[in-house]
Every structure is written in C-alpha cells, then in structure tokens.
Amino acid sequence: MSFFSNLRAVNKLYPNQASFITDNTRLLTSTPAGFTNVLNAPSVRNIGNNRFQPGYQLSNNQFVSTSDINRITRNNDVPNIRGVFQGISDPQINSLSQLRRVDNVPDFNYHTKQTRSNAVKQNFPETNVRTPEGVQNALQQNPRLHSYMQSLKVGGTGILLATGGYFLFSAATLVQDIINAINNTGGSYYVQGKDAGEIAEACLLLQRTCRQDPNLNQSDVTICPFDPLLPNNPPELTNMCQGFNYEVEKTVCRGSDPSADPDSPQYVDISDLPAGQTLMCIEPYSFGDLVGDLGLDWLLGDEGLVGKSSNVSDSVSGKLMPIILLIGAVLFLGLIFYFIYRYMMKGGGGGGVGAATSPTPIVISMQNPTPTTAPR
C-alpha cells in the first residue's frame, strides 16, 4: 500500500495501543525519508470508554495525533510540516507532492483556496459580506474586480466552485448572481480526487448538513446520491442532526471532520475510505470566500494587488525624497567648499613651498645702439 493509504488507515480510534503499533509498523514501510524520525515514536492517548487516540510523541514531549499528521501532509501545510518534522529539507517535503499525485489526494487544492480566501477577508474586510448591499459596496471599492466579473457575466459561462456548485450568470444583475452562488454553498461534502488530485469532484451530503441556507437551489448544486460511509441510510445517519444547535457548535455540519475532537458531533472516522477521497465541512461562503475560490484576489484594490504594491512603494519614496534631497544638498555644498579651499592653497600669497618653486623671471635688457662716425 502507498504512504497516504497507510496513513489514512491509522486515522481512527483504537481499542488498545498494541493494535495501533501493528498498523504503524506497516505505515513505516512506505514512509518517505525525513518523516520516519516522528513516525518511529508511536504513542496513544486514553480518551475513555476503551478508546485510544493514536499519535506520536515529539522530541519536545508534545503529542501529535495521526489525524493531525494526515491533515498537514494531505494539505501540503508546509509551516506545520516543518513544525512537526524538525530539520526536514525542502526536497523531502517536495517528495510528498508525487505521493499525493499517486493517490489522487485532493485536499491541498482546498487548503490553498481556503488560505487565499482567509487572506482576502483579512486584507479586504469589505468582502466579508453575504448581503446584496454588502456585495455592491465591495464591488464599488474594488473597481477592477467589478469590471472583470462584469465581463464574466457578459460571457455567460458558468464556473465550477470547490463546493461542487456553479457560479452561474443567469440573474438580472451581477450582484444577484453573486448572492445566488453564495447561497448555494455551505455543508458537508464528499470529495473525490481525479487526475493526480488536480481535479476534485464534490457533492453535498444533505443528511450531514445540519443547517442549509433557506435560499439553497438544489438544482444548481450536486447532491450526493448516497452516503459513502453509511450507504444504507441507517438511523445513525438519518438522525445525525437531531439536537443540532448552531450557536453552540459554530458549524453547519456534523460527522464531517476527521480532525475534529473525537468526542464532538463533528468527528467522523474515514479510515475505510480510499486515500483519494475525503469528507469535509465547508462553511457558507462570504463574498471574500467566493473571490478566493475563483482566484480573483489579484484584482482587489483600486488597481489590484500589483497596483496597491506600487502605490505603497510610491508612498515610501515620497516620504524619503526630502531626506534624499537634503543629503544631496549637503554633499554638494561640501564639494564646493573643498574646491575653494584647494584653489586658495595653490593660488594664495608668497612664501612657503609656492615661493621656492616659482619660476625665475626672464629680464630682457634693452640697450641703445652705439653711434658710428662717418669718415670725413
């Protein structure tokens, strides 16, 4: 089995430590260089009711769970990979890319889009909105984005989103198109990677989505025909959202996050799924999330991010220019005084070296001619 298949297999709770040690031995046979120093130190945490959470004991005595190892390696979360696998090299981290491609792991694309969306909402807070008024205001503050999206609407071609739905241009206005796309996001998704994980096919798991947008248009969203873990619709699935409280749980899903606290209703065991498949909860989009999903963050700002960077440079240059001019003036005056001093030293009064070396004047004596007496 491949590295990510073996890593997925240990992403579950165990009845005892010995069972995990056995599975981890199999994992080590497929572990690439740079990662064995951590995976060679298996450990467990007793979380009660004969359940043991598997993981690894780091050199600083910190415990990291197998679910966290799965999450950071599948997401290509380089900062956290470096934090866990101390001293790992760039080539060793890059080796995971090929292993992900072998198993069609799709997670890293979602992680990249989520990271981009978070940056959009942080740097341009006006995009963190879900109302028509908020979207209109965000478009007005970002004219390049507005112009580009308007051109997309003129083209009329729908765009597939990470949630499996489409950004369609069928409403009377661009703002309403955006609101419709936002309303069709949020929930539990079953994701299957294709073409080395570069393409992801996602569908919405309605029975694991405990809070749907009231304006969700199911005809514009791909609904899963069955549940990949509970295909026979047992009571465990049909009753999953009983007692759901969004204000307490702060998420729209249950049974959709393999990295969640095992005692929370959000946790799910996906260890039986192939490495190229996963379940994930995606919270309802804001306009900023939509911009990040579409990869249009480069258009934000009055002149886009590039123009914004140029404006920052111009601002810095403007502040430094008076200082630069002052320094230049001082240097110029100093140069003038230097030449004046040199001139005075060379061409000044007698004495000294100058007098000793001055050339001797040439004196020309003019004599009257001697008269001659003519013979008489």
Swiss-Prot record:
This is Per os infectivity factor 5. Pfam families: Baculo_E56. It comes from Autographa californica nuclear polyhedrosis virus. Keywords: Glycoprotein, Late protein, Membrane, Transmembrane, Transmembrane helix, Viral envelope protein, Virion. The keyword Glycoprotein applies. Signal peptide: none annotated. Belongs to the baculoviridae E56 family. Expressed late in infection. It is found in: Virion membrane. Structural protein that plays a role in the first steps of per os larva infection. The lineage of its organism: Viruses, Viruses incertae sedis, Naldaviricetes, Lefavirales, Baculoviridae. The chain crosses the membrane at residues 154-174, 320-340. GO terms for cellular component: membrane; viral envelope; virion membrane. Glycans are attached at N183. InterPro entries: Baculo_ODV-E56.
